[in-house]
Regions:
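Bacterial N-terminal signal peptides
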Residues: 9-17
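N-proximal helix/coil linker or "cap" segments that precede and/or mark the start of modular domains
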Residues: 16-43
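Short loop/turn microsegments at loop-to-beta-strand junctions
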Residues: 37, 62, 144-146
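A short beta-strand-turn-helix
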Residues: 40-62
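Structural microenvironment flanking redox-active thiols in thiol-disulfide oxidoreductases
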Residues: 77-116, 126-132
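Thiol-/selenol-based redox modules, centered on thioredoxin-like
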Residues: 143-184
Length: 184
């Protein structure tokens, strides 16, 4: 019960932050064609921890990099579930999915199994250093809900920012399909 109440409070705080920072900040992200900043972060998948490196992930194909405000809040859990439910679709497009928030790695270990269903890596970005590089910081302690599709050449192929988690999966899948069609 306390976790539910705490999650509700965090959700309300994030909503209040969105209101206070204004529309411009909520919709900011790196531009199409920009070079994606390289990074390496500790990440969890299925409760196991390893380093996730953008350069290594891009060697295998495009990367869907999505930032979210806080693990175990309702919107972030919903978004993680949606990504996990569609992981086979991402794999068909040879894409790697990586989730990122400012939560510590111990929290991400649990989130990777419970919310992400062990389907993809979820990284810990303490201090939101990587979120800042990607113009995905909502407030001091929270990343914005921003999704990127990074082409294999390391450029931003698609960017989408919206605190409503519902469209991030469909939009990134559509962007990957367009990217795949353009390569043919």
């Amino acid at each position: 019960m306390r976790k539910v109440a705490a999650a509700a409070v965090v959700t309300l705080l994030v909503a209040a932050l969105v209101t206070s920072v204004g529309v411009r900040r909520v919709t900011a992200h790196l531009a199409h064609g920009a070079t994606a900043p390289e990074f390496a972060l500790q990440a969890a998948q299925g409760g196991d921890v390893a380093t996730v490196d953008l350069k290594e992930a891009l060697a295998k194909g495009p990367v869907v990099l999505y930032f979210f405000p806080k693990s175990f809040t309702s919107g972030c859990t919903t978004e993680a579930h949606l990504f996990s439910e569609h992981i086979a679709d991402f794999k068909k497009l040879n894409a790697t999915v990586i989730g990122v928030s400012g939560d510590d790695i111990e929290t991400q270990k649990k989130f990777s199994t419970e919310a992400c269903r062990s389907a993809f890596r979820v990284a810990s970005d303490p201090g939101l250093k990587v979120a800042k590089l990607y113009d995905a910081q909502l407030a001091d302690k929270y990343a914005n809900r921003t999704s990127y599709v990074i082409a294999q050449d390391g450029t931003i192929a698609y960017a989408y920012t919206d605190l409503d988690a519902a469209k991030h999966v469909d939009n990134t899948l559509d962007a990957l399909k367009s990217l795949s069609a353009a390569r043919k």
